Amino acid sequence: MQLIDGKSLAHKVQENVAKEVEELKQVKNIVPGLAVLLIGDDPASHAYVNMKAKACERVGFYSITHNMPDTISQDEIIATIEMMNANPRIDGILVQLPLPKHIDTNKILEVIDPKKDVDGFHAYNVGRLVTGLDSFVACTPLGVMKMFEEYEIDLEGKDVCVVGASNIVGKPMASLLLNANATVTITHIFTKDLKAHTSQADIVVVGVGVPGLIKEDMVKEGAIVIDIGINRIEDGSLVGDVDFKNVAPKCSYITPVPGGVGPMTIAMLLSNTLKSAKQRA
């Protein structure tokens, strides 16, 4: 069993981004810029945004965070996004999810200029991904693909089970795998027999937010398991969606939680923002 070390890979990605940022500054006098919209006072969202701001600083980005109260109107959010769309210093716009209940998330995401949609959530970019065209791709699935690449895991012809069909993780993950010529099964809350699908798969990718959902008897010997789940349990520790202790010995590769997929998400956000800045150049 080999651990896939997301922490060290994310560090490597960030180092490469920092080098390219320095070159972009020297040659084109361009500093990549990321704007983040943070609405309300959800502690987890604030923690994520702080991590993103620190990462931007480390690689030499310009970054700005718009903190807004959860009483804000949809029109005010739209006006702020439109202002950032028009700002030439901003290459990436990120709206921290989830949004308050009175806000239509899809409508907000659709206002973002697709060329600045570094989270890859705009329908334009989703459509390009599905059809196999170059696009901005959601950062977590993109991070998983980077892991496969780094560890030289060949996806062609592999049976892959994606557990979870969210717009943010499951669906883009399935599209990326399909584009890499894997045979993809997507399971979700209405799937009758989850084990029947996961136990046949060469690779299981899970991201549903249910601690310990994937048990030892649900994966085959030698499988590759990618755990995207991050759950804080009663004793305060972070665990994934996989029963790591019992599943890991059966795997050829597995990602730990924490230190697996999580760090890759921010690394790929930086990578996407750099990509946008280079298009500006």
From Swiss-Prot:
NADP(+) binds at residues 164-166, 189, 230. Keywords: Amino-acid biosynthesis, Histidine biosynthesis, Hydrolase, Methionine biosynthesis, Multifunctional enzyme, NADP, One-carbon metabolism, Oxidoreductase, Purine biosynthesis. Pathway: One-carbon metabolism; tetrahydrofolate interconversion. PROSITE patterns: THF_DHG_CYH_1, THF_DHG_CYH_2. PANTHER family: C-1-TETRAHYDROFOLATE SYNTHASE, CYTOPLASMIC (PTHR48099:SF5), C-1-TETRAHYDROFOLATE SYNTHASE, CYTOPLASMIC-RELATED (PTHR48099). Catalyzes the oxidation of 5,10-methylenetetrahydrofolate to 5,10-methenyltetrahydrofolate and then the hydrolysis of 5,10-methenyltetrahydrofolate to 10-formyltetrahydrofolate. This is Bifunctional protein FolD. It comes from Sulfurovum sp. (strain NBC37-1). The lineage of its organism: Bacteria, Pseudomonadati, Campylobacterota, Epsilonproteobacteria, Campylobacterales.
